[in-house]
């Protein structure tokens, strides 16, 4: 019956846990853990999880899981354990009724009142980081993710780190994201207080999480202690037993002296607050006027700032122990964290395990770097964004204002110098004039150089943004083509975005050329061929991308009209640009030559119109197979190699998309779209419409004529070669030849020909 009652109580507790889980995840996790403790203990209902706390020179403390209060060591002898294994053994001794399997350092420090020394009546309050005694199978904590905060986790099966190391890792990870650590927990235990991973919640630095009106007093204290923990130091490694004895005796002597002074004065013992970050209490923890706690028990931001200043302004202290532990301390004179050797005990709180953790705590001691107020400096120091053009205009205006200010100052100095130099000889006045002319020339040269740098930076950023947008649009377009079954509406939307991205690149190139043409015609004439080549490549790349639609003929026919409209709009812009170039009298000859390179517009008709009797449903074509196209990483459509191409390519059967102007682009092979059985009746007209422009047709004809000429010449040479072996001249006979060789030479002189060689020559023809 007792077992049945216990099982019923456990089932009832689990049901309550499930009901509370939807309301508050952390409370549910804690309730479930306490219920497990109660079931494991078998004696009463647990209200707290088992924990122990240590402070050298004082008796160890542990939590009474039935009352939730801290109690001293029952034997009255145990104090300051040396290793994590000893901590685990002590947990098992204190809680024999529980199945303690591991220990873990707590995330937050706690304030323990009335902490007494062994065989002494003197008691004080100390803030320490306790150890949790884990019961049964390890269960990770349930973390609450407030609004605007983010949840992360890290798992590294190849490493096994202690709790404090993971704490440092997650703090640095949040700082890297520009956020602060809100809460964290451990994952996958691999040893005593060692784990394979962690989970954590990061919140924005300006995020202030308001406590709920129904939050209990314990939860409020945990939040306040969490703020205090942000400035806490790493716990040191456990020292040796000899170090423990030396330091414990020193602490005992100090406490006895203090106790005698208090008894002589007859004053009551006043509890103070000592911070406990290392394994031991330092002699100088309260050297620099520790901040008194607030009357309401909370720690204000002012108190925290004062405590950080007191910590980070201390000098490095090795301590009385003789271990060799590389640590970091904040050097106030240098404004950065510097290495030093820690002895293993004592010392002060300016003691950190890593440089990043040191800087995270003491960064408020570094005076902030003044932000640049000049728009030009701001432009160069910030990366490109959607406001690139506006920031460029502001920087250019600021550059012009700065140049005018410098010129006005030099002009004013020049005028003052001329007034003072009226009575000087002519040679000296001439030298003065040359000096100021050189200054003006240098300022103009400097302004031109700064403006050139600004323009080049702007162009590079714009080109990079255009390339990124085009790449993303092309990837989406190819992904839409690869979908099974392909959706015409989605393909058309992706194609519109891709064509729009290409058009933005075209307009940017045109506007830049027109601007250079208006400012510097000579430079425009030099870059004109490059601009025309780039525009031609844009059109070829667009046509090659459109030609991929022949892999899905049903979709191509359905969106044919919309594609024609897109091409007509872009062709109108291109014709306007060509006409604007031709109107320039300086470049008429070049424009007329290069304008012929631009292929005439042909509406997009990839397939002949199908009759109503012909079935145009998707089952006529085979959809692209996943794994044969883009899905393959090595041979896929998008997984192709990157290459820098500096000249126009020829459109061959591989349909390679290229790029010029030293812009890295992806090269796509249309054969890899794959999975289709090409039909000559449908593929032929498409390639003729897309790849055979007037200039390309002339080039092909020239190549064909050249090939035919080579073939004819080769045939003529072969025909002559048949009779080329007959020689009617006199051949000198070598005196050392055998009679057979001499006879063969005579026969060849009279027209003899080996029939075997003649047969082989005829076979080659």
UniProtKB/Swiss-Prot annotation:
Membrane disposition: Single-pass type I membrane protein
Compositional bias annotation for Basic and acidic residues: 272-284
Motif position, NPXY motif: 752-757
Binding site for Cu cation: 163, 167, 184
Residue ranges, annotated region (CuBD subdomain): 147-205
Subunit note: Interacts with CPEB1. Interacts (via NPXY motif) with DAB2 (via PID domain); the interaction is impaired by tyrosine phosphorylation of the NPXY motif. Interacts (via cytoplasmic domain) with APBB2/FE65L. Interacts (via intracellular domain) with APBB3/FE65L2.
Descriptive protein name: Amyloid beta precursor like protein 2
Lineage: Eukaryota, Metazoa, Chordata, Craniata, Vertebrata
Gene: Aplp2
């Amino acid at each position: 019956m007792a077992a049945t009652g216990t099982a019923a109580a456990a089932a009832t507790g689990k049901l309550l846990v499930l009901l509370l889980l939807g309301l508050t995840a952390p409370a549910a996790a804690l309730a479930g853990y306490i219920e497990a403790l109660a079931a494991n203990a078998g004696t009463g209902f647990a209200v707290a999880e088992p924990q122990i706390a240590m402070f050298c020179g004082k008796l160890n403390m542990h939590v009474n899981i039935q009352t939730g209060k801290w109690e001293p060591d029952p034997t009255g002898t145990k104090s300051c354990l040396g290793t994590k294994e000893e901590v685990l053994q002590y947990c098992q001794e204190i809680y024999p009724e529980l199945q303690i399997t591991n220990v873990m350092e707590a995330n937050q420090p706690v304030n323990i009142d009335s902490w007494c020394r062994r065989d002494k009546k003197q008691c004080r309050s100390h803030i320490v980081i306790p150890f949790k005694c884990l019961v049964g199978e390890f269960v990770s904590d349930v973390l609450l993710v407030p609004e605007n905060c983010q949840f992360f986790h890290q798992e590294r099966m190849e490493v096994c780190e202690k709790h404090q190391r993971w704490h440092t890792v997650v703090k640095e990870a949040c700082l890297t994201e520009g956020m602060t650590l809100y809460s964290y927990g451990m994952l996958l235990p691999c040893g005593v207080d060692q784990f394979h991973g962690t989970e954590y919640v990061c919140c924005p630095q300006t995020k202030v999480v308001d406590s709920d009106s129904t939050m209990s007093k314990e939860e409020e204290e945990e939040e306040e202690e969490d703020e205090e923990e942000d400035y806490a130091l790493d716990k040191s490694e456990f020292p040796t037993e000899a170090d423990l004895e030396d330091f414990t005796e020193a602490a005992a002597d100090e406490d006895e002296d203090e106790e005698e002074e208090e008894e002589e004065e007859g004053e009551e013992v006043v509890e103070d607050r000592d911070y406990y970050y290392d394994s031991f209490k330092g002699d100088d923890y309260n050297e620099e006027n520790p901040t008194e706690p607030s009357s309401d028990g909370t720690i204000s931001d002012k108190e925290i700032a004062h405590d950080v200043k007191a910590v980070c302004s201390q000098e490095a202290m090795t301590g009385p122990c003789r271990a060799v532990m590389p640590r970091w301390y904040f050097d106030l004179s240098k404004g950065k964290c510097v290495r030093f050797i820690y002895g293993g005990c004592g010392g002060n709180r300016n003691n950190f395990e890593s440089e990043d953790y040191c800087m995270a705590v003491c960064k408020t001691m570094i005076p902030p770097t003044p932000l640049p107020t000049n728009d030009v400096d701001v432009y160069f120091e910030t990366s490109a964004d959607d406001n690139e053009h506006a920031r460029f205009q502001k920087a250019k205006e600021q550059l012009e204002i700065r140049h005018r200010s410098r010129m006005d100052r030099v002009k004013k100095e020049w005028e003052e110098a001329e007034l003072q130099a009226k009575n000087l000889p002519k040679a000296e006045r001439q030298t003065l004039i040359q000096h100021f002319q050189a200054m003006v020339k240098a300022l103009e040269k400097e302004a031109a150089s700064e403006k050139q740098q600004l323009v080049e930076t702007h162009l590079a950023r714009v080109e990079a943004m255009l390339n990124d947008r085009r790449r993303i649009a092309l990837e989406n377009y190819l992904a839409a083509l690869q979908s099974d079954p392909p959706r015409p509406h989605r393909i058309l939307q992706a194609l519109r975005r891709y064509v729009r991205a290409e058009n933005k690149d075209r307009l940017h190139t045109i506007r830049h050329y027109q601007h250079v043409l208006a400012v510097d015609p000579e430079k425009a004439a030099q870059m004109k061929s490059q601009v025309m080549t780039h525009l031609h490549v844009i059109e070829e790349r667009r046509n090659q991308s459109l030609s991929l639609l022949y892999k899905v003929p049903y979709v191509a026919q359905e969106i044919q009209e919309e594609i024609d409209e897109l091409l007509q709009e872009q062709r109108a812009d291109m014709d306007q640009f060509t006409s604007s170039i031709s109107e320039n009298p300086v470049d008429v000859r070049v424009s007329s030559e290069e304008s012929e390179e631009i292929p005439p517009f042909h509406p997009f008709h990839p397939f002949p119109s199908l009759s109503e009797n012909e079935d145009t449903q998707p089952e006529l074509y085979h959809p692209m197979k996943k794994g044969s196209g883009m899905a393959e990483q090595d041979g896929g459509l998008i997984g192709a190699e990157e290459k820098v191409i500096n000249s126009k390519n020829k459109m061959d059967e591989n349909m390679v998309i290229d790029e010029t102007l030293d812009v890295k682009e992806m090269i796509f092979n249309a054969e890899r779209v794959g999975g289709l059985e090409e039909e000559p009746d449908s593929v032929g007209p498409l390639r003729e419409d897309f790849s055979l422009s007037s200039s390309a047709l002339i080039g092909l004809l020239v190549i064909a004529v050249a090939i035919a000429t080579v073939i004819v010449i080769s045939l003529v040479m072969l025909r002559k070669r048949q009779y080329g072996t007959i020689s009617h001249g006199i051949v000198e006979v070598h005196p050392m030849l055998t009679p057979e060789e001499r006879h063969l030479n005579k026969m060849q002189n009279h027209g003899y020909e080996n029939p075997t060689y003649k047969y082989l020559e005829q076979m080659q023809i």
